[in-house]
């Protein structure tokens, strides 16, 4: 199907149905929340019944945005729906919400590694954020761009482009942002809510994690580590680590960051970020994860030092333009 046909099929499916559940990936970020909330507001404007259900709460700064406190946090869907719209989620299991597959599933995503689940699928890997796709969908639905819808689209784009730092941005990105500002978005207020709403515990946790930062011998890769005892000592939480990974990239020489977050035993959630042409999405894929060229993640098991060395070796190869799949 062409892009136009994919959007039209989704528009037709929405028009033929009344009750919708909307969800995204577990531990949702700004693009996940912004995309699903923009869609929810648009569907309600059409007179549809909508419930947004996520496995986890949004990060504290994003809780300030319209409708986000009303998202139902639950491990399973409770209700009868005509369709499930899954936004910005590469695999249905990653929602962390069971029962979604009982409905007509529409899969809208920009992750290259999407597994292709659902009855209708629309992938746009070139989109800088799923929020860009949501803008096109809402335009196709003929729903006016309200301030609430526009704010969530702008939130999605702002956060998933690393504040317009990532190479995924395009002229289209700024055309959409222009439209959201014309609809009443205050970009300064959005930025302040996202980036200037730190608690003291979060600031202390940043200090603890950065204080323990390691730098690979080449000086090009930063290694971060987090566990629950660090959070308790700082008076912070797991969610307070959101955004921390981007700070080492502000150092000119640093080309990539690996952030190990301890889960239990020898299991770690690994977040990856990079600059320019360093494709850490391919590295995440080696470990069963995925994401984008400059932002990705995976889960890894093993001794921490061994994992550090393994990731550094693969990232160094990627920086040098060699294959990391060795």
Task: Indicate where each model-derived feature is located.
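Short acidic, glycine/serine/threonine-rich loops at helix termini
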Residues: 34, 64-66, 117-118, 135
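An acidic intrinsically disordered interaction segment
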Residues: 1-8, 93-102, 126-134
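Short, hinge-like loop/turn segments at secondary-structure boundaries
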Residues: 68-71, 123-125, 275-276
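Generic enzyme active-site microenvironment
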Residues: 23, 27, 86, 107-108, ...
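Short alpha-helices
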Residues: 111-177
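Short, motif-level signal for alpha-helix interfacial/capping segments enriched in acidic residues
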Residues: 2-9, 87-88, 138-140
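Hydrophobic helix-and-loop "lid/oligomerization" segment in the mid-to-C-terminal part
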Residues: 2-26, 32-63, 75-81, 159-287, ...
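Active-site cofactor/cluster-binding pocket
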Residues: 66-68, 74-120
């Amino acid at each position: 199907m062409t892009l136009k046909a994919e959007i039209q099929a989704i528009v037709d499916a929405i028009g033929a149905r009344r009750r919708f559940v909307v969800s995204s990936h577990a531990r949702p970020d700004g693009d996940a929340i912004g995309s699903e909330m923009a869609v929810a507001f648009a569907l309600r404007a059409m007179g549809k019944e909508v419930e947004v259900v996520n496995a986890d709460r949004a990060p504290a700064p994003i809780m300030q945005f319209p409708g986000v406190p009303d998202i139902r946090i639950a491990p399973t869907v409770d209700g009868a729906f005509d369709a499930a719209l899954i936004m910005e989620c590469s695999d249905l299991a990653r929602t962390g919400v069971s029962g979604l597959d009982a409905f007509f599933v529409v899969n809208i995503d920009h992750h290259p590694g999407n597994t292709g689940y659902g009855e209708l699928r629309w992938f746009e890997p070139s989109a800088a954020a799923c929020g860009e796709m949501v803008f096109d969908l809402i335009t196709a639905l003929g729903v006016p761009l309200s301030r609430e819808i526009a704010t969530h689209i702008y939130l999605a784009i702002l956060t998933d482009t690393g504040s317009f730092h990532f190479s995924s941005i395009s002229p289209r990105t700024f055309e959409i942002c222009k439209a959201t500002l014309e609809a009443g978005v205050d970009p300064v207020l959005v930025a302040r809510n996202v980036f200037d709403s730190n608690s003291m515990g979060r600031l202390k946790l940043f200090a603890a994690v950065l204080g323990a930062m390691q730098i690979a011998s080449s000086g090009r890769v930063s290694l971060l580590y987090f566990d629950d005892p660090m959070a308790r000592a700082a008076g912070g939480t797991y969610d307070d680590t959101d955004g921390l990974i981007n700070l080492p990239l502000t150092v000119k020489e640093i080309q990539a960051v690996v952030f190990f977050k301890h889960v239990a035993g020898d299991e770690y959630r690994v977040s990856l970020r990079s600059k320019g042409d360093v494709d850490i999405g391919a590295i995440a894929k080696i470990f069963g994860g995925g994401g984008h060229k400059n932002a990705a993640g995976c889960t890894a098991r093993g001794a921490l030092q061994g994992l550090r060395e393994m990731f550094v070796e693969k990232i160094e190869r990627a920086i040098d333009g060699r294959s990391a799949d060795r």
